[in-house]
UniProtKB/Swiss-Prot annotation:
The protein's role, per its UniProt record: May function as somatic storage protein during early seedling development.
Keyword set, alphabetical order: Glycoprotein, Signal, Storage protein
Top-level taxon: Eukaryota
GO terms for MF: acid phosphatase activity; nutrient reservoir activity
Gene name of the record: VSP1
UniProt similarity note: Belongs to the APS1/VSP family.
GO cellular component annotations of the record: plant-type vacuole
Reported tissue expression: Expressed in leaves and in gynoecia, especially in styles, the basal and distal ends of ovaries and in siliques.
Name of protein: Vegetative storage protein 1
Record InterPro entries: Acid_phosphat_B-like (IPR005519), Acid_phosphatase_pln (IPR010028), APS1/VSP (IPR014403), HAD-like_sf (IPR036412), HAD_sf (IPR023214)
Species the sequence originates in: Arabidopsis thaliana
């Protein structure tokens, strides 16, 4: 009989969150005995109906923010308490957001702005200026699947979202520097009325443009926002900076420096 090493047993325990009744013992033994366990892990786990678990949620979060962990549908179930603590209890989310926004302000303050054009800063909306935490708190802080479009329906029903104070401070400081905000969101245009009301309620009352996605558009967030930015540049705007909570907000033909805010709740493909 082959003896499985303790280290491999611990590795399996750290990477498998639950075993469905269809999972086969030979398949698991194959995974444990494999000399290339990490190469075979994802394929075998998928085949056996298992899901990957992350024993260190702080490390998982780092992987998300650095775009090393991508294409996840939900937060790992075992990381619910970590995400709640990060966003609510420990205030670390606020501290991290403050650091990003402070650096954005220092960068903007040091710019030599052009006098012959309109200098603008691109803001994302959800989880940049406004927070979706109240919504995702109802669904296990991102650990539970929600139906496509459920968040938009929630907003359309009249629910408002709180402002994110650190980004709101940046918004105010940029206005004082003479840099005008342009808000680009992947919210449907049919949500413009509730969006404007929500923005005004948190103190965002001035913007050069508030651009929402055409109803029913099939463009990905990356393509949509890239097209909007290119259109703004062609109109003569000088984009000096960009801030958002997803890399999808910030990649592909992005003039000016980009600043990535933390968000462990969900992932938008980039």
């Amino acid at each position: 009989m082959k003896i499985l090493s303790l280290s491999l047993l611990l590795l399996l325990a750290a990477t498998v969150s639950h075993v469905q009744s269809s999972a086969s013992v030979p398949g698991l033994i194959e995974l444990l005995e494999s000399n290339t366990i990490f190469g075979n892990e994802a394929e075998l786990l998928e085949k056996e109906g298992l899901s990957i678990n992350y024993p260190n949620c702080r490390s998982w979060h780092l992987g998300v923010e650095t775009s090393n962990i991508i294409n996840f549908d939900t937060v790992p179930a075992n990381c619910k308490a970590y995400v709640e603590d990060y966003l609510i209890t420990s205030k670390q989310y606020q501290y991290d957001s403050k650091t990003v926004n402070k650096e954005a302000y220092f960068y903007a303050k040091g710019l030599a702005l052009k006098n012959d054009t309109v200098n603008v800063w691109i803001f994302d909306l959800d989880d940049t200026l406004l927070s979706s935490i109240p919504y995702y708190a109802k669904y296990g802080y991102g650990t539970e699947n929600t139906a496509p479009g459920a968040y938009w329906s929630w907003l359309e029903s009249g629910e408002s979202t709180p402002g994110l104070p650190e980004t709101l401070h940046l918004y105010e400081n940029l206005l004082e520097l003479g840099i005008e905000p342009i808000i680009i969101s992947d919210r449907w245009k049919k949500l413009s009325e509730v969006t404007v009301e929500n923005l005004k309620a948190v103190g965002v009352t001035k913007w050069k443009h508030l651009i929402l996605k055409p109803n029913g558009s099939k463009l990905t967030q990356v393509v949509y926002k890239s097209k909007v930015r290119n259109s703004l540049v062609k109109k003569g705007y000088n984009i000096v900076g960009n801030i958002g909570d997803q890399w999808a907000d910030l990649v592909e033909d992005t003039p000016g420096r980009v600043f990535k805010l933390p968000n462990p709740l969900y992932y938008v493909p980039s």
